Amino acid sequence: MVGMKAIVRMKKRTVPMSMSELLYKIKSFGARRKLFSARSCFEKKRLPELISLICAAFMLCALPLLFHNAFFDINRFKVEAVCRIVPALALLMGTAMLLARTGEKRIPHPGRATRLLMLLFLVACVIACARTGFESATLDGSEGRYCGLIFMLCCGAAFFIIGEGKTCARLLVLIVICATAVALLGLVNAMGFDPLGFYARIKTGQETVFLSTIGHFDFFGTYLVMLFPLAGGQFVFSEKRGMRMFGLSCACVMALGAMASRTDSALIGLHLACFALLAISGGSLPTMAHALVLWAMACAALPVMCVLLGFSTFHPQISGLPKLLFDLHAGEALCVLLLALAAACVWLARRGRKAPGRRKTAAVLFSCFGLATLLLLGTMVYFSVVDTGRNLGEAASFLRFDDSWGSLRGFAWIRAMRAFADAGPVQKLFGAGMELTLRVLTPYFDDPSMLRGGVFNDPHCQPLQMLLTCGLLGMAAFVLFYAATLVTLLHHARHDPLLCGAFASVFAYSVVMLINVTQPILIATYFSVCALGLSALRAQRSSGGNTHEP
């Protein structure tokens, strides 16, 4: 009663306040305070997160589906969209972050080294172009594949914008759905159907070269390789049966789409993604069984797609590593073996056996992967240096490093290394300028027979491309950024579906990075997936657990 009288005196009331009226006043004050707090959170703290989600949706959902009526304009069309929209989002993000500075302690960024290396890479790109006086060809990339300075800065800005937010589970579902739509459209095109009129203005015989809204079949397959692990992560690590079935269905469609591209990089990348998901699935036998089933489905995708392509009206040709494995029936054999291992994991789990720990499983499998890689490199060195006369047949295209290695990639790699060796010290350090590779390599095109498919405006190796255009500084930042992102995601992934999927995606990107060109859709997707993983880490750190289960 003493406290009540004090409150009444403060309000200068003459009539005593009842207990019920006092409680009503307290509740009303608390409700108003809560409403004000929520409104402030939406207007200030949540605004950067909203812009981050919009940017991620644009880069990973809208951009792959953007399409122009002429196939040869796909690159330029997507690049122009990025260069128009991302700067506006960056301006909004900067304004929102200034408004959100309330003096409260911010959540520290888990990937600080990754962000610094990205910044260093962008600085290296600017320096390389500054040495040319910011020539227009270096800004818009018109002499290459349109990965000029402006586009690279926009992709870097998108990386920082997406990484500043907190990825939600619904966004992940939307990304997977959009990637599945791209894969379905590519499968329809590969089977000889053209529902959207893609081939109306294309030359006869080139229908098998372009698939879906991505364009060239090589980039179509490698794009799906980067998105396949996000769906696979849902199947392997999700605790909800519905999400597991959703993830498996989408992953199977994307695996078939990747095999429809008929490329070595898509085939290798798909299996690298499955291997990475299996390597980090330790600690739970059912989870390991899911990873083995996913890998088995990926193995079955090659023979299934090869049979389906036989009925296509366009009659696409299968060559290289996919044809070799199809003729050997390796996909069917590996599928049966993996399904048997998955059944063994389920049987052991029902008998109460424990799975090996996550760290031990990852250490053993990644060690085996490292030994297999060293063995492959040693075999290549042996047949390239020691036993150069042995007839290897079709295997020579990837076991003997010469001008014909990797569908003429060896020719571009060797000339790129010669050009770098002949460059001056300043150019070696800072590069010749973005997308000026053709100028650098043209004096070294000494074998006209190797140019029957066209000249090389890219050495078909992204680190080599960065070495020629951005110098040692740019290449070192690019490679270290990849390594830092991979280590960060592996260290924090645990059994979070999105983080594990992002790790597998970055791990599979290694083959894309080594044997593919620096293509706009690949760079944009790669940087965005890396940022998606970092934003998921921020969300995990703020909530203290897995946050990517819708």
What would you call each of these model-derived segments?
Residues 11, 16-46, 104-110, 319-321, ...:
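Membrane-interfacial, low-structure loops and terminal tails that flank and connect transmembrane helices
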Residues 18, 24-26, 30, 43-44, ...:
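Alpha-helical transmembrane segments of multi-pass inner-membrane proteins
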Residues 66-80, 138, 200-214, 314-326, ...:
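Juxtamembrane membrane-water interface segments that cap and precede transmembrane helices
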Residues 72-78, 139-144, 217-218, 262-269, ...:
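Membrane-interface catalytic loops of GT-C/OST-like multi-pass glycosylation enzymes that act
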Residues 74-83, 109-112, 143-144, 323-332:
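Interfacial loop-to-helix junctions that mark the boundaries of transmembrane helices
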Residues 96-108, 126-139:
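Transmembrane alpha-helix boundary signature
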Residues 216, 407-455, 470-474:
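TM-adjacent membrane-interface loops and short helices in multi-pass inner/ER membrane proteins
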Residues 352-395:
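Long, low-complexity, polar/charged, intrinsically disordered or flexibly structured peripheral segments
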